[in-house]
């Protein structure tokens, strides 16, 4: 009869949901993510659960030591002065920018809902329709900001922008919504595309989900980087302690030999 390792079974139960999550998150990559690395190495989510193995051998330790040194070397390269594209790239990858985008998307969704309630007469509008006009122009201003965001993202990331499906879909929704909203500005009557416009604008709530995922992923990457740095420091400290212990052991052996040679070891014991 074959014996089942309970630890292996537990590991498989942990890996299964992690594997599903990794396959789901790889479709939510955005500009700034390493597209090829994410698609090739997305199994790192499940591999993290399988890293509970014995300590590496000396050869592996040397290999691992080369890795941090290489990373430290690459990180210690002098920073060049940031040009306009580099500053924009840093801005688009920042956590604060994602929070601003989420807030604007929420505000845009609320404005569209308010317009919808006024159009359906659920909320009685004023006689001059000032509220509808104000909501519409505010929503259009937010769309202009999103259009500028897409333009500068394409300017900064170029072909990398088109490697991310979610960015393409989000850009499509923004552009179509912008065109329809622009037509509505010059049309006094409501036309048949108004329902499509509302549907597209409300669909952008998915951007909120994407922003939350990016924020969580960014914080996780920062935490992983911090833990790696702590791990490197602890590994260096362990090496120093092991070297110090070996020196102490050699010194003890040398002193024991001297005691034996002088016949003092028995008296000491």
Swiss-Prot record:
SUPFAM superfamilies: Voltage-gated potassium channels (SSF81324). Residues 46-79 are annotated as: Disordered. It is a multi-pass membrane protein. The dimers display cooperative channel gating. The channel activity is inhibited by zinc ions. Its main location: membrane. The modification Phosphothreonine is found at residue 29. PANTHER family: F20B24.22, VOLTAGE-GATED HYDROGEN CHANNEL 1. This is Voltage-gated hydrogen channel 1. It comes from Mus musculus (Mouse). The gene is Hvcn1.
């Amino acid at each position: 009869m074959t014996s089942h390792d309970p630890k292996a079974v537990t590991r498989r139960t942990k890996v299964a949901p992690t594997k599903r999550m990794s396959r789901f998150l790889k479709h939510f990559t955005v500009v700034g993510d390493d597209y090829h690395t994410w698609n090739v190495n997305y199994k790192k989510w499940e591999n993290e659960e399988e890293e509970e193995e014995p300590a590496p051998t000396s050869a592996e330790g040397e290999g691992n030591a080369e890795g941090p040194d290489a990373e430290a070397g690459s990180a210690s390269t002098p920073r060049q002065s940031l040009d306009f594209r580099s500053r924009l790239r840093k801005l688009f990858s920042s956590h604060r920018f994602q929070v601003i985008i989420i807030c604007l998307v929420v505000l845009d969704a609320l404005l569209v809902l308010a317009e919808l309630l006024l159009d359906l007469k659920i909320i009685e509008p004023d006689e001059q329709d000032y509220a509808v006009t104000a909501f519409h122009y505010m929503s259009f201003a937010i769309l202009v900001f999103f259009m500028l965001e897409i333009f500068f993202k394409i300017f900064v990331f170029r072909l990398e922008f088109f490697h991310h499906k979610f960015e393409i879909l989000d850009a499509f929704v923004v552009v179509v919504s912008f065109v329809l909203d622009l037509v509505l500005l010059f049309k006094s009557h409501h036309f048949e595309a108004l329902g499509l416009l509302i549907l597209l604008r409300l669909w952008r709530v998915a951007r909120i989900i994407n922003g939350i995922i990016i924020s969580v992923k960014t914080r996780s990457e920062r935490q992983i980087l911090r833990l790696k740095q702590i791990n490197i420091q602890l590994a260096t400290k362990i090496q120093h302690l092991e070297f110090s212990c070996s020196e102490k052991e050699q010194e003890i052996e040398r002193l024991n030999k001297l005691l034996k040679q002088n016949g003092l070891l028995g008296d000491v014991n």
